[in-house]
Design a protein with these regions (language model features):
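Short active-site oxyanion
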Residues: 1-5, 80
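Mixed-charge interfacial surface used for oligomerization/domain docking
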Residues: 4, 10-24, 29-31, 35, ...
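Class I S-adenosyl-L-methionine
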Residues: 36-104
C-alpha cells in the first residue's frame, strides 16, 4: 500500500528534508498589512521582520477547507492513502478544516500533532519512516497519537514583542520582560504554549543555559534524533549553539532547520529551540 505524507507548513522542515522524505506541505496564510501570502511559497521570515520594522501588522490564518481538499485530491492521484499531520488544534483551525476536507476525499487520515514548528516536523519524519517500513495507515495514526506526548518542543525568545502583537503575551508581561532583560523559554505542553524557565543575560549565554537545562535529566532523553530550529539570528549564534549542543549530549542524528514565516510571525527574530523525544511523557 502506497502512503503519502502531507503536513502543515508550520513543520519548518528544510526543502532538502522534505524532498528526501517526500513530504508535501499545506501552506498557511501570512497577512502583512492587507496583503496575503503563503508560508514557504512567496514570503520569507526576513519579509516578516522587515514588514514589522516598518510598522505593518503581521497575522496568520489557517489553511481553509478548499485548499486542503485540493491538496489531498492532488496527492492522492499517485497513492492509496494520505496521512496529514496538522499543527496542534489548540493553536489553529487547521485541524478542523483538514478533517472536513478529508471527509470529501476518502482514505485521508488527519492527525493532530499537538505541536508546532519542528516538533511537528519530527513527527512527520517518523511518519514517513513508518510508512516506508510497511505500517498501515491505522497503525501509523495510532503511533503518532502516542508519540505526540513524547515530543519535547521548546524555544527561547530574545524578545516577546511578536508574541504580544499576536495576542499570546500581555503588554504588561512584554514590558516587564524587556525592562528586566528576560529571555523566556516557551514550551509546548499538552498542546498549548506555556512559559518555562526565564533567563537573563546575553542571548548566547541564555541559550547555553537553556540547552543544558533541557538535557539535564538524561535518563528521560531519547538520543536517536535532535532538531535545532531558529529564526533569523545574529551572525554565528546558531552555529555556536550547534557546537555547544554537541558538547552537552551526543545524539545519533542532529538536524538543523530554520523557522518558517508562520512561526516567525509569532516569535520574531533571535529565537532558537531544540526539539527531541522523551522516553516517557512529561509528568
Amino acid at each position: 500500500m502506497k502512503i503519502r505524507v502531507t503536513a502543515d507548513s508550520t513543520c519548518d522542515l528544510s526543502p532538502e528534508l522534505r524532498a528526501s522524505y517526500g513530504i508535501t506541505l499545506a501552506p498557511l496564510t501570512v497577512m502583512l498589512g492587507e496583503d496575503a501570502f503563503h508560508d514557504g511559497v512567496n514570503v520569507t521570515p526576513q519579509d516578516i521582520i522587515h514588514a514589522v520594522e516598518n510598522g505593518k501588522t503581521c497575522k496568520t490564518a489557517a489553511v481553509n477547507v478548499y485548499e486542503y481538499e485540493e491538496l489531498f485530491r492532488r496527492v492522492k492521484e499517485d497513492c492509496d492513502a494520505v496521512i496529514h499531520l496538522c499543527i496542534g488544534k489548540k493553536f489553529s483551525a487547521c485541524y478542523d478544516n483538514a478533517c472536513q476536507a478529508a471527509k470529501q476525499c476518502g482514505n485521508v487520515y488527519v492527525v493532530d500533532s499537538g505541536n508546532l514548528s519542528v516538533g511537528l516536523g519530527m513527527m512527520a519524519l517518523d511518519e514517513v519512516e513508518m510508512a516506508r517500513a510497511g505500517k498501515t495507515p491505522q497503525e501509523i495514526v495510532q503511533a503518532l497519537e502516542a508519540e505526540r506526548d513524547l515530543i519535547d518542543t521548546s524555544f527561547v525568545l530574545d524578545q516577546v514583542d511578536y508574541l504580544r502583537n499576536g495576542g499570546r503575551c500581555s503588554g504588561v508581561a512584554a514590558v516587564g520582560a524587556k525592562l528586566l532583560h528576560i529571555k523566556p523559554c516557551i514550551e509546548v505542553e499538552k498542546g498549548v504554549m506555556v512559559v518555562g524557565k526565564k533567563y537573563r543575560g546575553s542571548f548566547a549565554r541564555c541559550l547555553e543555559h537553556y540547552v543544558k537545562d533541557k538535557l539535564e535529566d538524561r535518563s528521560q532523553v531519547d538520543f536517536s534524533r535532535v532538531m535545532l530550529a531558529y529564526s533569523p539570528c545574529e551572525p554565528g549564534v546558531a552555529e555556536q549553539m550547534l557546537n555547544y549542543l554537541g558538547t552537552v549530549a551526543e545524539f545519533k542524528e542532529t538536524l538543523v532547520c530554520t523557522a518558517g514565516s508562520t512561526i516567525c510571525c509569532h516569535c520574531g527574530p533571535n529565537t532558537l529551540g531544540i526539539i527531541f523525544k522523551r522516553k516517557t511523557p512529561k509528568a
